[in-house]
Design a protein with these regions (language model features):
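Acetyl-CoA-dependent GNAT
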Residues: 2-73, 84, 152
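Conserved acyl-donor/pantetheine-binding loop and adjacent beta-alpha core of acyl/acetyltransferases
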Residues: 25-26, 30-38, 53-55, 123-146
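Conserved acetyl-CoA-binding loop-helix of GNAT-fold acetyltransferases
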Residues: 70, 76-91, 116
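Conserved beta-strand-loop-alpha-helix junction that forms the acyl-donor binding cleft
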Residues: 101-111, 126-132
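Conserved acetyl-CoA-binding loop of GNAT-fold acetyltransferases
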Residues: 115-124
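Conserved GNAT acetyl-CoA-binding A-motif
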Residues: 91-104
Length: 153
C-alpha cells in the first residue's frame, strides 16, 4: 500500500474524511496548513479522492497524529495501520522520540488498533469533547474524554 505525502490544497473529498474523524471544522482548520504550516497530510488512494488520510503535526520530541480516517467502504483493509506505520517510520527517520495519538475513550476499535500497533496509554484529557459545539455519540455513548496514547522509540 503506497502512502503519499499530500502538499496541495485540500478538496471536498479530503474534508469529508477529516470531518468524519473530527467533526469540529474550526478545530480541524487550526491544525492544517496554512494555519499550521508544519502539518503533514499523508494519504492512500488518489490525490483528488483519497481512501484514507492522516494529519501529523510536530510536537516536542515527536509527532502527533491529529486526524486519521478511512472511507467507510474501504475500512478493515489495513489502510489506517499503513498510515500510522508510515508516520512511525517518518518520526524514527527524523530521530524523534515518540508519536502520540488521541481518541475518545468510547472509540473501542480505534484504541484496540493503536494498542495493537504498539501505542501505550499515556493519559486522559477529561472533558475534551464536551467543548465541541455538537455532542459526539460513538458506540451509543457520549464522547467526553480523550485518551492519549504514545509510541516511544
Amino acid at each position: 500500500m503506497d502512502v503519499i505525502r499530500y502538499d496541495k490544497e485540500l478538496n471536498r473529498a479530503h474534508w469529508d474524511l477529516l470531518l468524519q474523524a473530527d467533526p469540529w471544522f474550526e478545530a480541524v482548520q487550526k491544525y492544517l496548513p496554512p494555519q499550521n504550516p508544519q502539518a503533514e497530510v499523508f494519504f492512500i488512494g488518489h490525490a483528488h479522492k483519497p481512501y484514507a488520510l492522516c494529519v501529523a503535526v510536530p510536537i516536542e520530541d515527536g509527532l502527533e497524529i491529529k486526524n486519521i480516517a478511512t472511507r467507510t467502504i474501504m475500512r478493515r483493509q489495513g489502510m489506517a495501520s499503513a498510515l500510522i506505520n508510515h508516520v512511525l517510520l517518518v518520526a524514527k527517520q527524523r530521530g524523534l522520540a515518540m508519536v502520540e495519538i488521541g481518541t475518545s475513550t468510547t472509540s473501542r476499535d480505534q484504541i484496540r488498533l493503536y494498542e495493537k500497533l504498539g501505542f501505550k496509554r499515556d493519559g486522559i484529557l477529561r472533558g475534551h469533547f464536551l467543548s465541541y459545539p455538537e455532542p459526539i455519540i460513538e458506540n451509543g455513548l457520549l464522547a467526553k474524554d480523550m485518551l492519549m496514547l504514545q509510541y516511544k522509540f
